[in-house]
Amino acid sequence: ATIDATISLELITEASKRIVPNAAAVLDVGCGAGNYTLKMLSKVPNLSCTLVDLSLPMLDKAFERVSAETNGKVVVKQGDIREIDLEENSFDIILAGAVLHHLRDDQDWETTFTKLFKLLKPGGCLMISDLITQDTDLLNEYTWQRYGEYLEGIGGAAYRQKVLDYIEKEDSPRSMNYQLDLMKKVGFSKVEILHKNMCFGAFGGIK
């Protein structure tokens, strides 16, 4: 139950196309069924695509869907982006949709952002669409209250509780400010905010 998922997907892929109009290779981190890559291919055709996910059934589905839409090479890698071996300076675009909020402590975040930075070619971009927090506790409480009301509106009180309990147990999102600052720290030359609505945002950085 993501707020503004459609517009965030549109914005990060359109921004990627404009930042790297001659892109040849995309990496999709936590690709799921391949929706982000498919949207990217609708804007920049025939990219070579590397799809990473923990779930083999999802990877199989993504491979089938993406292969049908590009003449470029499609590579699938099952596993965690933190552990998978990929060649540095080899991607024009990295897409990370609803995945980085699984990172845990500061070291985990910094190590992962450093790795993603190194995987990009100079001038390439990392684009993120994800669950986020606020830096101010009072505002953070407010945004999660709003999100809870949104969830209840689409699925009732039990659905709201189920989603929020899952997030509490499984996820450790950070604020957009934290992630943009971290991008600068690990070497990104520019960072950009594309969209934000309560506890969801779309943003990125250019190497």
Regions found by a protein language model. Give the residues of each.
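Short glycine-centered segments of the SAM/dcSAM-binding site in methyltransferase folds
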Residues: 25, 124-125
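C-terminal alpha-helical "lid/dimerization" subdomain adjacent to the S-adenosyl-L-methionine
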Residues: 129-186
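Class I SAM-dependent methyltransferase SAM/SAH-binding core
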Residues: 25-29, 33-83
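A short acidic, Gly/Pro-enriched loop at the edge of an enzyme's catalytic core
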Residues: 86-94
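Core SAM-dependent methyltransferase catalytic element
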Residues: 184-207
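A short glycine-rich, Lys/Arg-flanked "PGG" loop and its adjoining helix->strand segment in the class I
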Residues: 110-122
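Conserved alpha-helix/loop element of class I SAM-dependent methyltransferases that forms part
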Residues: 5-22
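A short beta-strand submotif of the Rossmann-like class I SAM-dependent methyltransferase core
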Residues: 96-100, 128
